[in-house]
C-alpha cells in the first residue's frame, strides 16, 4: 500500500530526533548566540577566502555585530575567526525524500554520487521512498564499501518506487480510459474491451456521459488524496529536526506529474453537442477547463519553520516527457507544490532545480550543503515573539549569497 510521503518523512524524523538530546533550555531572558549558515559562490565555485569584515548582517533591518566565523569545507573546519568559535566539526544529517511515480535510470548516477562524493563516516542518512523510510546505520559507512551501499540503496529505491506508486499509476490509466470514453473515442481498437459490458458507458448518450464524468471525478479525487501535501505534517517534520544538532540537509526529488484529460477538440465538440444541458456543461468545464490544483500548504509558514529549524532544504524537480495517450491529452499538474517548494529552498539557503539530470542537481545541492561559512551573532533584545528576518550582505561584488531567512523568537 502506498504511504503518504509526508507521513513517512515524519516517521523518519521522529526516529532520528528521538535519539538525539535537544540540550538544556536556557531562560528566554538570556540572549544566546545564533548560528547563520552562509554559502558564497562566484564563477561557479565556492568562495573560501572571506573574513568577518566581508559580511554585514541585519536583523529585521537593524545592523548587528558578528561574533565569529567558521569556514566549513566538506564537513571539516578549515578556518576560525572571532570569539567563541566552533571547536569540533558539526555532525551531518541527510534526509533524502523521493516523490516519484516512475523509476528514472538517471537516479542510479545520483545515488553513486551521493555515496562516492558526499557521505562520509559518521554521517546520519535517512532515505524516504514512496513506500517507507530507511535509516543508514551509523557504522555502515565504516564497515561496508560505498559501492555496496550505493547498490543497496539503488535497488531499494527502484523497488519501492515501482511498488509504492502502483496505485497512482493505476489511477492514471483509469483517467486515460475515462478520458477516451468521454471524448467519444473509447470505441477505438483496443480501448473499449474493459468497459463494453456496462451500458452506461455509452459516451454518446447523456446518461452515459454523466456516468463517465462522475467516474472521472471520483478517480481524480482519489489521485488527489494519495499525493496530498499536508501542512501540519511539514511543520511537525521541521519541529522534529530542530533539536538535531549540526548540519541538517533535506533533499526532495519530486517528479513532474501529468493528468490525462480530454483534448481541446473533443471538448469543443462536447460543449456544442450538450449546449442545452447545463449540468453536463458545468461538469465538463469544472473538470477540464477550470480545474486547478490549489496550494495544499502555506509556503510562508512552512518555509519559516524550516529556516528556524536550521534545515537547508533542496528541491530537485525531475522533468519527464509527457506520455502519448490515444484519445487523451496529458496535462502537466505540479502547479500546487512547485512554487511552495521553491520558496522553501530559497528561504533556507538551499537550492532548487528543474532537471532531467538528478545527479547534476544533487551535485549542486551537495556543494551548497557541504561548503559554507557559519556566522554567529547575539540577537537583539526580544520585544514581542515572532519571526526575525536575517539578511546577509557581502561587501565583495559579484558573489551569490545563500542563507536562511531567519528564526523565531518565542
PLM region descriptions:
Residues 22-410:
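Scaffold/interface architecture of coatomer-like assemblies
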Residues 6-7, 41:
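General helical structural elements
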Residues 1-4:
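Positively charged n-region of N-terminal signal peptides that target proteins for export
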Residues 7-19:
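Bacterial N-terminal signal peptides
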Amino acid at each position: 500500500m502506498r504511504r503518504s510521503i509526508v507521513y513517512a518523512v515524519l516517521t523518519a524524523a521522529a526516529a532520528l530526533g528521538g535519539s538525539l538530546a535537544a540540550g538544556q533550555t536556557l531562560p528566554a531572558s538570556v540572549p544566546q548566540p545564533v548560528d547563520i549558515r552562509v554559502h558564497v559562490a562566484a564563477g561557479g565555485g565556492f568562495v573560501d577566502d572571506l573574513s568577518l569584515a566581508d559580511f554585514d548582517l541585519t536583523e529585521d533591518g537593524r545592523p548587528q555585530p558578528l561574533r565569529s566565523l567558521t569556514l566549513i569545507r566538506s564537513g571539516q573546519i578549515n578556518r576560525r575567526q572571532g570569539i567563541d568559535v566552533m571547536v569540533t566539526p558539526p555532525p551531518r544529517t541527510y534526509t533524502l525524500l523521493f516523490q516519484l511515480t516512475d523509476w528514472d535510470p538517471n537516479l542510479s548516477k545520483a545515488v553513486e554520487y551521493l555515496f562516492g562524493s558526499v557521505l562520509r563516516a559518521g554521517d546520519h542518512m535517512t532515505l524516504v521512498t514512496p513506500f517507507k523510510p530507511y535509516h543508514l546505520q551509523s557504522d555502515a559507512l565504516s564497515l561496508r564499501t560505498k559501492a555496496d551501499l550505493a547498490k543497496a540503496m539503488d535497488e531499494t529505491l527502484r523497488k519501492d518506487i515501482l511498488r509504492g506508486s502502483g496505485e497512482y499509476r493505476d489511477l492514471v490509466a483509469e483517467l486515460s480510459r475515462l478520458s477516451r470514453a468521454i471524448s467519444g473515442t473509447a470505441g477505438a481498437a483496443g480501448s473499449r474491451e474493459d468497459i463494453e459490458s456496462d451500458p452506461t458507458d455509452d459516451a454518446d448518450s447523456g446518461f452515459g456521459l454523466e456516468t463517465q464524468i462522475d467516474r472521472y471525478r471520483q478517480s481524480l479525487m482519489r489521485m488527489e488524496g494519495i499525493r496530498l501535501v499536508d501542512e501540519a505534517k511539514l511543520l511537525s517534520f521541521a519541529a522534529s529536526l530542530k533539536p538535531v544538532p549540526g548540519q541538517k540537509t533535506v533533499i526532495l526529488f519530486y517528479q513532474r506529474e501529468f493528468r490525462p484529460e480530454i483534448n481541446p477538440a473533443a471538448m469543443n465538440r462536447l460543449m456544442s453537442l450538450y449546449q442545452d444541458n447545463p449540468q453536463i456543461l458545468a461538469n465538463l468545464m469544472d473538470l477540464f477547463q477550470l480545474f486547478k490544483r490549489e496550494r495544499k500548504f502555506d509556503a510562508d509558514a512552512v518555509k519559516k519553520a524550516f529556516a528556524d529549524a536550521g534545515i537547508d532544504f533542496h528541491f530537485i524537480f525531475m522533468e519527464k516527457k509527457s506520455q502519448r495517450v490515444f484519445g487523451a491529452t496529458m496535462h502537466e499538474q505540479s502547479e500546487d507544490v512547485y512554487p511552495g517548494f521553491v520558496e522553501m529552498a530559497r528561504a533556507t539557503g538551499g537550492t532548487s532545480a528543474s532537471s532531467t539530470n538528478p545527479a547534476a542537481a544533487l551535485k549542486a545541492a551537495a556543494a551548497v550543503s557541504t561548503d559554507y561559512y557559519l556566522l554567529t551573532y547575539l540577537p537583539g533584545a526580544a520585544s514581542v515573539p515572532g519571526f526575525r528576518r536575517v539578511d546577509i550582505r557581502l561587501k565583495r561584488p559579484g558573489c551569490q549569497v545563500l542563507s536562511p531567512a531567519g528564526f523565531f523568537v518565542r
